[in-house]
Structure formats: C-alpha cells, structure tokens
C-alpha cells in the first residue's frame, strides 16, 4: 500500500469516528430530554440548567456527557479490521450517506413520544455497516494486460529490382563513306571454258512427207430415190374428253376402221383410200400412176370414223385440211416391198378425232 492509500485510509477512519461520536451523542441527548423541560433538546447541547419549579433537586441536572463513552469503542474496533484486509481502492460512497440521514430526523419529530421508543429507533446499524462494506469487497485483481503481441515485423519488401532500361542504342553514326578506293580491277580470271559435252545428236526428224490431203469425201446428198411408187403410213386416235380442246394425244385411244384419203393434184385428180386396223395404223398405197417424183402435190385427209361417239375430225397435224407427205430418211427403212413392188415410204399424222363428251 502506498503513501496515498494510507493517507486516504487514515482520513476515512477519522471521519467515521467523528460521525459515530456525533450520532451517539445525539442519541444520548434524546434519552435525557424526557425528564427535562419541554424545550427542544438539540438547542441545549451544553450545560443544562434545572427547571425552576422543581426545588427538590438541590443540585443542577447531571451533564449528559457520561454516555459519550460509547463512541470510544467503535474507533478502537474500526482501525483493527481495516488493516487486516487492506483495500486497494477505498470506497468513498458510504461515508457520505451516513451523516445525512440522522440530523434530518430529530428536528421533524418532537420529543413528545414516550421515553421507551427512542432507544429502540436509533439507527445504530448504518454507522456499523459503513466501515464493514469497504473491507468486504474482494481484493482488486491486478490489471490483466492483454498479451503482448509479438513484435510485428515490417513486411519485407521484395528486393527492388533495378529499373530495366531499354538497351541504349548505340549512337547512330552517320554512315561514313568508305574511302573511295581506286577501282581495283578484279584479277583477270582465266576464261572459264564451258564444259565440253559430247555433241548432242540432233533429233532425227522423220522424213517430212509432203502434206497429204485428206481424202475428199463426196458431198452427202439426200438419198436419191429411184423412181418408185408411193406408200403413205400413219395412225389415227380418238382424243380423251379431258384434253379434247388441246392439240395433244394424252389419254387418246387408237380407232379401228377410220377412213383415210390420199389426194394428188395433177392433170388428173388421183385419189386413194384405206382404213385403220385395231391399233389405229394404216398403210395407204397410191395408184401406180403416182411416183416419188411427184409426191409434193399429194395430201392425206382424215375422212370419217367408224365410232359415232368419236367422229369429229380434229386439227391435229392437219388432218382436217390435208397433211403433207414426209419421206422416211432412215437408211434401210425408206422403202417397202408390197406384192413384189417397191414403194417409197412417206409419213403423215398422227391424226385424231374429237369425242362427243357429255356437258
């Protein structure tokens, strides 16, 4: 305990002794007041004069100081207990509360109450509690300091790399022209002889023969017909109702027994007729007076049909106005032999009749 702690403790003990003595004196004075005059006791705290009407007391009233012996005991006990448990920090609060309460109560209540009650009420406990509470506090623990942190080493900075400077370019010197040396003629090399190869034989050219003229082919003329008789072939169909208005044979069917007529215009009108077979095919032989030399004046007409439901001549390939004869140009098929007579073969058509379709 330091010097400051000791001085505070001594002053606290002295203050406690003073307040306890004052309080006990007040209590003793209250106990003596019932036998005295009705004047208030607190104002005659010194020598008390006897009341005039009571003459049987020859001597004045004994002084109220004898009860002052009681405050002597507390100071003796009080200093003994504090040294046993020296508080580190003396509490200051209890001493201030104890002296405030006792002085205020006596002036409020007049000393009219019976003498038996005042000794019971005196607050003897507060003075005793005040010195007791301070030592009961546990000794103040030494301040716990936070664990000392290990000295933080400053972060080691990475070794500072020396600044890398770009490679300093060598000072570009202006191109110093080399000293112009006199033109040194290179040493005259001996003339390099070209490698001597064996004489290459000239390519043997084939003997140039005079240009052979391509064989002159005679001009191809259309096959010349010998004078022959005329035979005309073709087919006849019945058009379908769906395509009756079009010049097409889609859906058409061959007609059997249809009549075809050949007309050759000359000095004499020559005619010939024939009918178709079940496949609609016909071969019309011209009269023997008509030869292949005069076929250009001949025409073939579609005359009539055996089927009355399909008998209207259509305009397909000129069957209604007469179709021109076209000679067959395929070799080997341009002639036909009938009854040991050779006929030149010509083509017409195909022809067709329009059907009578329901509306």
UniProtKB/Swiss-Prot annotation:
Keywords: Cell wall, Glycoprotein, Hydroxylation, Proteoglycan, Repeat, Secreted, Signal. Hydroxylated on numerous prolines in the proline-rich region. Residues 67-215 have a biased composition (Pro residues). It is found in: Secreted, Cell wall. The modification 4-hydroxyproline is found at residues 71, 75, 79, 82-83, 87, 91, 95, 99, 103, 107, 111, 114-115, 119, 123, 127, 131, 135, 139, 143, 147, 151, 155, 159, 163, 167, 171, 175, 179, 183, 186-187, 191, 195, 199, 203, 207, 210-211, 215, 219. Residues 31-215 are annotated as: Disordered. Residues 1-24 form the signal peptide. One of its GO terms (biological process) is response to jasmonic acid. Induction: Down-regulated by wounding, abscisic acid (ABA) and jasmonic acid (JA). Expressed in vascular bundles of roots, leaves, sepals and stamen filaments, and pistils but not stigma. Transmembrane segments: none annotated. GO terms for cellular component: extracellular region; plant-type cell wall; plasma membrane; plasmodesma. Sequence repeats lie at residues 90-109, 122-141, 142-161, 162-181. Glycans are attached at residues 71, 75, 79, 82-83, 87, 91, 95, 99, 103, 107, 111, 114-115, 119, 123, 127, 131, 135, 139, 143, 147, 151, 155, 159, 163, 167, 171, 175, 179, 183, 186-187, 191, 195, 199, 203, 207, 210-211, 215, 219, 226, 269. Residues 44-66 have a biased composition (Basic residues). Belongs to the non-classical AGP family. Proteoglycan that may contribute to the strengthening of cell walls. This is Non-classical arabinogalactan protein 31. It comes from Arabidopsis thaliana. The lineage of its organism: Eukaryota, Viridiplantae, Streptophyta, Embryophyta, Tracheophyta. The gene is AGP31.
């Amino acid at each position: 305990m330091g010097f400051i702690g000791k001085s505070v403790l001594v002053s606290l003990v002295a203050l406690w002794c003073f307040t306890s003595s004052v309080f006990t004196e007040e209590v003793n004075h209250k106990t003596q007041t019932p036998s005295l005059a009705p004047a208030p006791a607190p104002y005659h705290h010194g020598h008390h004069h006897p009341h005039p009407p009571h003459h049987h007391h020859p001597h004045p009233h004994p002084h109220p100081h004898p009860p002052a012996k009681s405050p002597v005991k507390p100071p003796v006990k009080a200093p003994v207990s504090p040294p046993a448990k020296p508080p580190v920090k003396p509490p200051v609060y209890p001493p201030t509360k104890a002296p405030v309460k006792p002085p205020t109560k006596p002036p409020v209540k007049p000393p009219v109450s019976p003498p038996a009650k005042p000794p019971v009420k005196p607050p003897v406990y507060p003075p005793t509690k005040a010195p007791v509470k301070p030592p009961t506090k546990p000794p103040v623990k030494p301040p716990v300091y936070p664990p000392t942190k290990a000295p933080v080493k400053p972060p080691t900075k990475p070794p500072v790399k020396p600044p890398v400077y770009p490679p300093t370019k060598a000072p570009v010197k202006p191109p110093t022209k080399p000293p112009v040396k006199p033109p040194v003629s290179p040493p005259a090399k001996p003339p390099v002889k070209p490698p001597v190869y064996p004489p290459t034989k000239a390519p043997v050219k084939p003997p140039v023969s005079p240009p052979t003229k391509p064989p002159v082919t005679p001009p191809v003329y259309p096959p010349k017909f010998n004078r022959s008789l005329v035979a005309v072939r073709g087919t006849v169909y019945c058009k379908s109702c769906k395509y009756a208005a079009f010049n097409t044979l889609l859906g058409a069917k061959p007609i059997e027994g249809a009549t075809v007529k050949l007309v050759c215009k000359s000095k004499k009108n020559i005619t010939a007729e024939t009918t178709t077979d079940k496949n609609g095919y016909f071969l019309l032989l011209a009269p023997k007076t008509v030869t292949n030399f005069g076929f250009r004046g001949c025409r073939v007409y579609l005359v009539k049909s055996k089927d009355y439901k399909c008998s209207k001549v259509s305009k397909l390939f000129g069957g209604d106005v007469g179709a021109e004869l076209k000679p067959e140009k395929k070799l080997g098929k341009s002639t036909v032999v009938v009854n040991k007579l050779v006929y030149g073969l010509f083509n017409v058509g195909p022809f067709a009749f329009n059907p009578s379709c329901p509306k």
